[in-house]
């Protein structure tokens, strides 16, 4: 008998239209009715929120104390410089975090390729990207730029505790990090036909990236993430937690208490100790006849002992298996 999942159509045609290096259209058809929106929306959300990438998270500009200032001899203010830095497309191959240096002197644009870096560790996809423009021949600009790997969108101050925020050195400028390499994605669902069936879906995904990843590779990664998350449901079973049975104590805890806890008269207590009756468990195993044979213990003391035991729900002549417990016998 054919399993039910094989009754569903799978895309027979996957067409990739490469509009540019960073822009592609991917078409999948045919899909069962409704699956176009189901898959399209799931992939879109993953591509926008969960794709790993690299972003600039911290910047220090020599001579600048805060983001609302300006740099003499530079056309852009600090806020505009930071916005330009945020749009740098960077790939990091080895490390999860690295600090880069930028130094430039003299009139002219400061571009991404002016950043000093090891090409075996990172690459800058848009090296001609303008960061700022120097308008004075004697002006120098020196920056320290921290690049980190991550995913999604992370606000600047969420990366630090409240105590760490107060300890940040003056002049360190924090940036909100958008790690996702996907800049724009949309999908549409059109009608598809297979033989006589006309109620099928065609899914068209239109996507642009920042150039650090091919659109096709981004789709593959998103599909892998989705598949991995759904794999937990494939072998879904109703797992019952094993019933934990409370272990009943081998003996009534009160039997492990010393005879002194009964607060007997001094005469009765001394008679019991003389017979090596130290625990209540030792006492309740004795019969009335055995106790009356104890030197200096008369009927009055016996009655006292019986009354005290009865007030605790105990009596003489009780049978206790495995007495004394191991930890008492070792004492």
Swiss-Prot record:
Residues 1-237 are annotated as: Alpha N-terminal domain (alpha-NTD). InterPro entries: DNA-dir_RNA_pol_insert, DNA-dir_RNA_pol_RpoA/D/Rpb3, DNA-dir_RpoA, RBP11-like, RNAP_asu_C, RNApol_insert_sf. Keywords: DNA-directed RNA polymerase, Nucleotidyltransferase, Transcription, Transferase. Its EC number is 2.7.7.6. Residues 251-331 are annotated as: Alpha C-terminal domain (alpha-CTD). It catalyses: RNA(n) + a ribonucleoside 5'-triphosphate = RNA(n+1) + diphosphate. GO terms for molecular function: DNA binding; DNA-directed RNA polymerase activity; protein dimerization activity. Pfam families: RNA_pol_A_bac, RNA_pol_A_CTD, RNA_pol_L. GO terms for cellular component: cytoplasm; DNA-directed RNA polymerase complex. The keyword Nucleotidyltransferase applies. GO terms for biological process: DNA-templated transcription. CDD domains: RNAP_alpha_NTD. Belongs to the RNA polymerase alpha chain family. The N-terminal domain is essential for RNAP assembly and basal transcription, whereas the C-terminal domain is involved in interaction with transcriptional regulators and with upstream promoter elements. Homodimer. The RNAP catalytic core consists of 2 alpha, 1 beta, 1 beta' and 1 omega subunit. When a sigma factor is associated with the core the holoenzyme is formed, which can initiate transcription. DNA-dependent RNA polymerase catalyzes the transcription of DNA into RNA using the four ribonucleoside triphosphates as substrates. This is DNA-directed RNA polymerase subunit alpha.
